[in-house]
């Protein structure tokens, strides 16, 4: 089973990203589970969401404490949240940032096996006109992990958002897929 933990802020779409990733994996015939963790969050407060993907039915119902993959939608969270808490030894960290690999590694408490960086904010602003990075970051997830193919991500996005909004969000994911930089750490 692959366990993914998303870190974002309220209103950024971390929960939607977790759900779309699950939908993309489901489209490929996998078993999935996606759910948010809500405390007293409000818009702008840190939010966590989770996705599990497996080849067999998923029976566990807990939060993800030891993720295989961590996805960070808002790089400012690196200053206040230990996003790598519990990350498995072979873990992958995917971050929306314009910063360099070295700048990001300085901020991580635990070094991942693989680090993927993409400026999803700029992609979202150029494609959608809004700094909502949830669909763009899924392109980076597809590229860095190989868990799902980009076509399944695009279809899941279009199933979630209809019409022009779906097309633009799918375009953002594809662009992020193409622009994601991956580093073995």
Swiss-Prot record:
Stated name of the protein: Pyruvate/ketoisovalerate oxidoreductases common subunit gamma
Native organism: Pyrococcus horikoshii (strain ATCC 700860 / DSM 12428 / JCM 9974 / NBRC 100139 / OT-3)
Keywords recorded for this protein, A-Z: Oxidoreductase
Entries under InterPro entries matching the protein: Oxidoreductase_gamma_subunit, PorC_KorC, Pyrv/ketoisovalerate_OxRed_cat, Pyrv_flavodox_OxRed_cen
Subunit field text: Heterotetramer of one alpha, one beta, one delta and one gamma chain.
Principal EC category: oxidoreductase
Catalytic activity, as annotated: 2 oxidized [2Fe-2S]-[ferredoxin] + pyruvate + CoA = 2 reduced [2Fe-2S]-[ferredoxin] + acetyl-CoA + CO2 + H(+); 3-methyl-2-oxobutanoate + 2 oxidized [2Fe-2S]-[ferredoxin] + CoA = 2-methylpropanoyl-CoA + 2 reduced [2Fe-2S]-[ferredoxin] + CO2 + H(+)
Superkingdom to which the source organism belongs: Archaea
Cited PANTHER family: PYRUVATE SYNTHASE SUBUNIT PORC
Family matches, as Pfam families: POR
Protein's UniProt keywords contain Protease: no
EC number(s) per entry: 1.2.7.1, 1.2.7.7
A single GO molecular function term of this UniProt record: pyruvate synthase activity
Gene: porG
Keyword Oxidoreductase: yes
